[in-house]
Amino acid sequence: YFDTVDLEEHRKSDAGELAKDKVRIRWYGDELDPHRLEAGGSSSVGVPGERSVEVWLERKSRRAFASTKQRLAVEAPASALTFTALEEGIVPAALLVDTMARFGLFPPGGRFCPVIAISYARCRFTEPVTGFRVSLDWRIRSSIVKPGLALGERGLVLPGAVVEIKGPAFHMPPALRPLADIGSSWTRYSKYSSSLDAHASARGSVSRAWPSGVMERAPGPIGWVSRTEQNGE
């Protein structure tokens, strides 16, 4: 995930503002783990003959209840996706800025800063009558990429799982209404901001890695239902 130097989009998300954007580079698969250190703790990016990986430059925009996603597929060297290389931004900074400009987003100061890497496992489901989509995300991990931010931790784990529902109407179809019985409330949720908030909390806090305001009394899976979308990123 990328942001301004002063984390303006994170601030907007935490404040619940109706107009906000997320800039990220996404890729898929278990092989390229963004939290893993290479042997020796360093990596060389763009070695001649190195294999390339398809990644997606994405802008996700939310305006009140409406959200849109724009993305462009490009090739990046596999070594650019290792933890020690992520602060360089994966792709040339000019390519990211130019792509976001084509999408209608212009960063203050003319640059985006790599901030945090987030990965997760996901299962997708589709309600066949209405086309509502349900995703279940778990094993959510995050690593700080921006130097000097929070404690700079790597591989911080969010317990439990996130359930997200996306569809053409605000009310869920009858087939999905039993999801309300998982014991959670409907709310907006951002993996980006929730992970940054967890990294900013003190080590040892009881509910540090849980989504804000949600914690179970006993160990076990947590149900978190949201209409937002937000697996290496």
What are these regions (language model features)?
Residues 1-233:
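Phosphate-end processing signature that detects enzymes handling 5′-triphosphorylated RNA
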